């Protein structure tokens, strides 16, 4: 047992020497951006799939990529890592140049992170009602019997990428 404790202590010392500690990674904008890029790449692949069953996986990966890149911006601006999944609120605190439509997209993606991307129903029926009566209605257009997505608000890959690029430029990256 003593040898195992010593070995773990040695591993921790190596991480400290190489700068790969919990605190270093937590405060590394680059780490947050890299993880955001990974989820964005997954969302891109899923968006190109012909398999309709992957839609929630696409939305979830797109939403998580935006949450991570927004938190990278917060860290870059010296605001720490906010403990929230409310992307619209996070974006507003960062003073990023988002349009009303983009903020609405972030609102929908927040619901996807919190529940609809992972579960068929939320923990509270009030979340269900808010999603279907308020949030989702901003993203659809009804014309008689026809319902379609609002092109400027729906989280298509193009809309998600435009939001992502605003954040990425904020941390010193160049648009993809």
PLM regions and their residue ranges:
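Hydrophobic alpha-helical segments of membrane proteins, primarily the transmembrane helices
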Residues: 28, 32, 58-61
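Short, hydrophobic, well-ordered secondary-structure elements
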Residues: 37, 54-75
């Amino acid at each position: 047992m003593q040898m195992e404790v010593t070995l773990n202590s040695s591993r921790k010392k190596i991480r400290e020497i190489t700068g790969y500690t919990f605190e270093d990674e937590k405060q590394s904008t680059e780490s947050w951006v890299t993880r955001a890029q990974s989820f964005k790449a997954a969302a891109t692949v899923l968006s190109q799939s012909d398999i309709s069953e992957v839609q929630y996986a696409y939305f979830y990966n797109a939403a998580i990529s935006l949450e991570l890149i927004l938190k990278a911006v917060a860290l870059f601006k010296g605001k720490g890592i906010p403990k929230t999944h409310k992307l619209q609120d996070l974006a507003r605190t960062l003073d990023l140049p988002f349009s009303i439509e983009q903020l609405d997209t972030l609102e929908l993606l927040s619901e996807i992170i919190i529940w609809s991307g992972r579960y068929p129903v939320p923990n509270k029926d009030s979340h269900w009602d808010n999603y279907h009566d308020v949030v989702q209605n901003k993203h659809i257009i009804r014309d008689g019997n026809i319902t379609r997505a609002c092109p400027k608000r729906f989280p298509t890959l193009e809309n998600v990428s435009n939001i992502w690029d605003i954040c990425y430029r904020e941390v010193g990256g160049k648009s993809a």
